[in-house]
Design a protein with these regions (language model features):
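Gly/Pro-rich cap/lid or specificity-loop segments adjacent to the active site
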Residues: 1-192
Length: 192
């Protein structure tokens, strides 16, 4: 199941401008007596799309030989989402479309000229982002992402979440659990 959840652009002004988060859900397949609630995931980044992450994770967990994998896969409603400004969430951040083209210098600058080239391109990228997306950029923080997660929890009518974060998603999970400790049932952090 896929859809959108409208959340405040600025949580200090909850009745002001709204943005739309792209959200997906793969419902639990176990009996209601074994249902464990919702499990939100984040692939990291920051800026990684999490909308389809669960379609990859669930089959991995269902493999034979994993002690608790099938139960984890089947007993939760798995919730994926594209963080604000990412992927299918709207508005989506768009800076310089050709920035990631094939015509760019090496990632590791080996000369002073390459350092200058990267600095010039980085400044141009940041300037273009600021001009085109300044209103959104000011609200693309980890705290905003954590508040978005709590909005997803509330919209689904759940008192708590279980969370599975990878890479930067581990930091996001820590921030969420700091802001909303009573809303965390279980927290799994993988890497970092």
């Amino acid at each position: 199941q896929c859809g959108f959840l409208k959340v405040p652009l600025d949580y200090r002004h909850p009745h002001g401008a709204k943005i739309s988060l792209a959200v997906s859900r793969i419902k639990h397949t176990s009996p209601a007596s074994e249902y464990q609630g919702i499990l939100l995931t984040n692939p990291g980044g920051p800026g990684g799309s999490g909308l389809n992450l669960n379609a990859f994770l669930i089959p991995v967990l269902q493999q034979e030989g994993l002690t608790n994998g099938p139960a984890a896969a089947n007993d939760y409603d798995w919730i994926g989402f594209d963080p604000r400004g990412v992927g299918s969430s709207r508005p989506a951040l768009s800076c310089l479309p050709n920035y990631f083209s094939y015509d760019r210098p090496n990632y590791i600058p080996t000369t002073a000229a390459l350092v200058r080239t990267w600095l010039k391109r980085s400044k141009a990228y940041a300037t273009a982002c600021g001009k085109k997306n300044g209103r959104l950029l000011a609200h693309m923080t980890t705290i905003d992402a954590a508040r978005d997660m709590d909005s997803i929890r509330a919209a689904l009518g759940q008192k708590q979440i279980t969370y599975y974060g990878f890479s930067y998603g581990t930091y996001l999970g820590q921030v969420y659990s700091t802001l909303f400790p009573s809303h965390v049932r279980r927290l799994v952090m993988d890497s970092n």
